[in-house]
Amino acid sequence: MNTAVTTANSEKAKALQAALAQIEKQFGKGTIMRLGEGEAIQDIQVVSTGSLGLDIALGVGGLPRGRVIEIYGPESSGKTTLTLQVIAEMQKQGGTCAFIDAEHALDTSYAQKLGVNLNEVLISQPDTGEQALEIVDSLVRSGAVDMIVVDSVAALTPRAEIEGEMGDQLPGLQARLMSQALRKLTATIKKTNCMVIFINQIRMKIGVMFGSPETTTGGNALKFYASVRLDIRRTGTIKKGDEAIGNETKVKVVKNKVSPPFKTAEFDILFGEGISREGEILDMGVNAKILDKSGAWYAYNGEKIGQGRDNAREFLRENSGLAVEIENKVRDSLGIALLPTAGGDAPEAKAAKAGKAKADKDGVIEA
């Protein structure tokens, strides 16, 4: 009986090898492989969102590259601000970014205040939804762009709708456009390691008795193809005296294919400045016991950095290197990806480079 089982297994192995050889001959080497070999398994490369709390909520330290991301929420909730912060973070890593401004409403001076280098950002203001998605497809296929933002799905108007009369009924046209585009884009996005962020708006479904009446525009395709979906909401207003200086914001990770979903993050968005990263570093640094808080004073490594949250936040803003050092210690304590330091590399990358340099010099790396 054992001989029969062995023979059957041997026949199956031969049949499998023949099938694999036929597939590789027809479609090219590397078309199919075992999951544990080659480059099939690799660490997820991420880009920080500009918010430490949101990076932690995402579970991997930021938004994953080579994936489709959807960010949606009500009007003036911080959707474009969040994506501009991600562009600024990608530029810090030396990445090339493109912004498809279908809404024709990008405020370039505000983007500059958030740290975006306008000279290094590609921008397009397309006339139709088809044109916008063709531009995205061309940029992704080039392999030279690291991140593309589409603002917004709701503004991707099909050509037939633009050329038709006002009031024409064209049901499902935008949903079909998005479905076709995402079918074409997904595989190329993965191969070129390009992150594509779609900003989306909220609509209300009529006649919903149970559950949430809210839905996003553009049909269901984006919900399926997106690896990460973020629901961003404004929860309150930050005031200095009687003057409003920012918004309190809450983000829920509604879908996450790279880590457990449904985690939330809360942070402040200050008008004209963007996400208050230093405030988050203070709060999480204290929680992780990396910063000491005694009364109103904040201290790091026994040295006082400010009395009161506002003063300590201002100190970290003026000393960005120290802020990155503290943030990386918080990230390390939580086991998520570290930020690049002033030299452009995360600490573990610097260590690897140092090891390689020593190997080149000595011919061997000491254990």
From Swiss-Prot:
Name the SUPFAM superfamilies for this protein.
Answer: P-loop containing nucleoside triphosphate hydrolases (SSF52540), RecA protein, C-terminal domain (SSF54752)
Keyword DNA damage applies: yes
One GO term of the cellular component aspect? cytosol
Which domain of life does the UniProt lineage start with? Bacteria
Q: Where does ATP bind?
A: G73, P74, E75, S76, S77, G78, K79, T80
Task: Specify whether Plastid is a keyword of the entry.
Answer: no
- Which InterPro entries does this UniProt record tie to the protein? AAA+_ATPase, DNA_recomb/repair_RecA, DNA_recomb/repair_RecA_CS, P-loop_NTPase, RecA-like_C, RecA-like_N, RecA_ATP-bd, RecA_C_sf
Localisation per UniProt entry: Cytoplasm
One Gene Ontology BP term is: DNA repair
Q: Keyword set for this entry?
A: ATP-binding, Cytoplasm, DNA damage, DNA recombination, DNA repair, DNA-binding, Nucleotide-binding, SOS response
Gene3D superfamilies cross-referenced by the UniProt entry: P-loop containing nucleotide triphosphate hydrolases
> Pfam families annotated for this entry?
RecA, RecA_C
Q: Which GO terms describe its molecular function?
A: ATP binding; ATP hydrolysis activity; ATP-dependent DNA damage sensor activity; damaged DNA binding; single-stranded DNA binding
Functional note: Can catalyze the hydrolysis of ATP in the presence of single-stranded DNA, the ATP-dependent uptake of single-stranded DNA by duplex DNA, and the ATP-dependent hybridization of homologous single-stranded DNAs. It interacts with LexA causing its activation and leading to its autocatalytic cleavage.
Annotated family: Belongs to the RecA family.
Q: NCBIfam families annotated for this entry?
A: tigrfam_recA (TIGR02012)
- Protein's recorded name: Protein RecA
